[in-house]
Amino acid sequence: AMVGLVNQARPGHVLTLEDPIEVVHRDKRATVTQRELGSDTRDWSRALRAAMRQDPDVILIGELRDAETVRAALSAAETGHAVLSSMHTTDARETVLRLVEFFPSHEQPRVRAALGASLEGVVCQRLVPRADGAGRVCVVEVGVRDARFAEAVADPDKTHDLPEVLAEGSWSGMQTFDQHLLALVQAGTVDVRTATMAASNPHDFGVMLRRTGWTPAGAVADDGAR
């Protein structure tokens, strides 16, 4: 989806490294070059080194799987390339921790510093059943680079504060999973039971619900009148 958005929005060279190629992108405003692991290249790090010689503006790495790939991705980002990728993690905080934990302890401070300087954002997704039974809806957690976000990424003592940073950063487009779930419950898109099961912190999610004064659609609040 991000490659498609870039392709529609602006000219430039987008280079993708995928395993396997799942969607073939036709050139629109951008030129899209797609490479497949196993067919066009033997490994991610080798592919990234070759990619840098093709003058890309945007590089998509199908998945960050090991330290060597993350190191190459950071190097590309530090030289001014926009780098997109994916990981199998549960939320923004785990994403940062996983990126750092690919590396031995003596390298982690440098990696954190590089991430703090280069990581522009994190988008995490979960699919949860709709209240009307008509399929699923995507719940999204978003972290966007600002001073607090960068500090929480770079400082191991503050990474645990990332959920709070996201929750308080709505002005810049940030939100936690639980905040989005709350909005979906209020809109009637997801029921409370499903939302609570999907919440990152079910107890805190319940507190959020009560603080909003939320009541189920069709319910009448008991104000003591008879």
Predicted segment positions?
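Short, flexible helix-loop junctions that flank or precede catalytic/ligand sites
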Residues: A1-R226
